[in-house]
A protein has these predicted regions:
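N-terminal intrinsically disordered, cationic/polar leader segments
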Residues: 2-67, 71-146, 151, 156-180
């Protein structure tokens, strides 16, 4: 039995949960928005007296793998519609800047042309000095968008210039020693 999968999920009062039996489709609605996800038929979700219990239909390898994952995904949906998720990135480097213009994030990263990224309906972007704050209700979408921003200019190991997550430690390398 999965240690994570067998834990119950408590549903807050302000969250509405709708479950479809025939195709294992779950809709979670809360104060921040609405999320929906389809789960495997090898997983059974039960809702009883304000708690969600995730069980597997059989003991196959696939069902065991999906058990803990499904429970965590449902928990993340509930946290997302009540509190939301956010990731903070910081820009290091001379002349590296980020600006927000409408629904567009403009990154000046030392390339010939500024890099432009567009907001989606699930994601909100805020720029505060050298920090970029990515927030939204879908944890997967927030993490992916933040990873896409970081991929535009990952931190390099010699000077540490680039885009990194807040608090991320960049392993530094020693440069050339030169001729003696």
């Amino acid at each position: 039995m999965s240690r994570i999968g067998k834990q119950k999920i408590s549903v807050p009062q302000n969250v509405k949960l709708i479950k479809s039996e025939e195709n294992n489709f779950i809709v979670v609605e809360g104060p921040k928005g609405k999320l929906e996800k389809k789960f495997s038929m090898k997983i059974k979700v039960r809702i009883e007296n304000g708690e969600i219990l995730v069980e597997r239909v059989d003991d196959s390898k696939e069902a065991r793998a999906l058990h803990g994952l499904s429970r965590t995904l449902i928990n993340n949906m509930i946290i997302g519609v009540t509190e939301g998720f956010s990731k903070v990135l910081e820009i290091k480097g001379v002349g590296y800047r980020a600006a927000k213009s409408g629904n567009k994030l403009i990154l000046n990263l030392g390339f010939a042309v500024p890099v432009e990224m567009f907001d989606t309906d699930k994601i909100k972007i805020a720029v505060d000095g050298d920090k970029i704050i990515v927030s939204g209700i879908d944890k997967e979408a927030v993490g992916q968008y933040a990873a896409n921003i970081r991929a535009k200019k990952p931190p390099e190991p010699y000077k540490g210039k680039g885009i990194r997550y807040l608090g991320e430690k960049v392993r530094r390398k020693v440069g050339k020693t030169g001729k003696k």
